[in-house]
């Protein structure tokens, strides 16, 4: 997908950001509860039920349920699954697994969207490094989400953070996105590309930034369920995401319970202090989801699992065209 020049990036008022913050806090709370619930033996359907309960108790509704026919409240992607894993009573977690949970909520007509990856019990040190590298890349990208920068600065920061962390596969077929009155809107936010390119970032924009990386290659395959995306080589994956408001003071992380203070002390403290947020209990790293672009699969099975037989879309092209693009 290319970002077309005739498409508009939604600009929010400070009051609208306050309303997005309410939705973001629902997501942040739900993810914290889910991360605490992850344990050997629990099913991904159990986690989905917990998410539905927490979102409903807050007076919100799930962003994902029914979206293009998606059948669940969260995406629960285990091990080689990168994104869009459908919760199932038959998918139970085992010690050493890695699960990525993507969660979205709508409150008062505004969306929040985040994701995180956690280990189930003790995990392989290489898996822990994978999770740490992905989360670090998310925060490096968020640090560049500043009015006056270019969208490519965010993408490049994610890319270089992953590159510096090790030999990881950086997923290109799925991207972050603008967010606000709808879950997926302009602009697409790739996790790679040159700095100084793309739309000029302005105060009032909101971005969902969400790197996805693997311990192997970057190629992906969509399974026959039409949703679950897995690594083509069977390697494990991680996914982190946050919804970020661009303010004159810096990035305000709407899906972090402390607004981002713990991770972005130099910029986020200014932005969060301007909003009057107080730091709560230690935050849980939030998560990711991308617009529904489908990867290509030509075979009928992969690692014993049925996959989609034909392409249903195309990845973001990488040219950060758009309003004010260079």
Each predicted region: which residue ranges?
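Active-site neighborhoods and metal-handling regions in enzymes and metal-associated proteins
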Residues: 1-326
């Amino acid at each position: 997908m290319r970002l077309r020049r005739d498409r508009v990036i939604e600009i929010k008022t400070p009051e609208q950001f306050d309303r997005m913050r309410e939705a973001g806090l629902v997501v942040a709370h739900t993810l914290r509860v889910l991360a605490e619930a992850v344990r050997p033996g629990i099913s991904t359907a159990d986690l989905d039920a917990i998410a539905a309960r927490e979102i409903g108790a807050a007076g919100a509704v799930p962003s994902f349920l029914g979206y293009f026919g998606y059948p669940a409240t969260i995406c629960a992607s285990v091990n080689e699954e990168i994104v869009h894993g459908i919760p199932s009573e038959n998918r139970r977690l085992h010690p050493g697994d890695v699960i990525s949970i993507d969660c979205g909520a709508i409150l008062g007509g505004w969306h929040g969207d985040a994701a995180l990856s956690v280990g189930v019990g003790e995990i392989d040190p290489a898996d822990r490094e994978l999770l740490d590298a992905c989360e670090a890349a998310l925060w490096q990208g968020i640090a560049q989400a500043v009015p006056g920068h270019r969208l490519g600065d965010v993408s490049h920061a994610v890319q270089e953070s992953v590159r510096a962390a090790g030999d990881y596969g950086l997923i290109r077929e799925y991207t972050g996105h603008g967010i606000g009155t709808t879950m997926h809107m302009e602009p697409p936010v790739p996790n790679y590309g040159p700095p100084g390119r793309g739309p000029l970032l302005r105060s009032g924009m909101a971005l969902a930034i969400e790197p996805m990386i693997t311990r192997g290659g970057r190629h992906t395959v969509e399974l026959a369920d039409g949703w679950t995306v897995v690594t083509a080589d069977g390697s494990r994956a991680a996914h982190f995401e946050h919804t970020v408001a661009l303010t004159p003071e810096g990035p305000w992380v709407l899906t972090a319970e402390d607004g981002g203070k713990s991770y972005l002390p130099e910029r986020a403290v200014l932005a969060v202090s301007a909003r009057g947020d107080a730091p709560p209990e230690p935050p849980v790293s939030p998560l990711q989801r991308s617009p529904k672009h489908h990867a290509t699969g030509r075979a009928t099975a992969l690692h014993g699992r049925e996959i989609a037989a034909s392409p249903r879309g195309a990845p973001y092209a990488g040219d950060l065209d758009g309003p004010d693009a260079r």
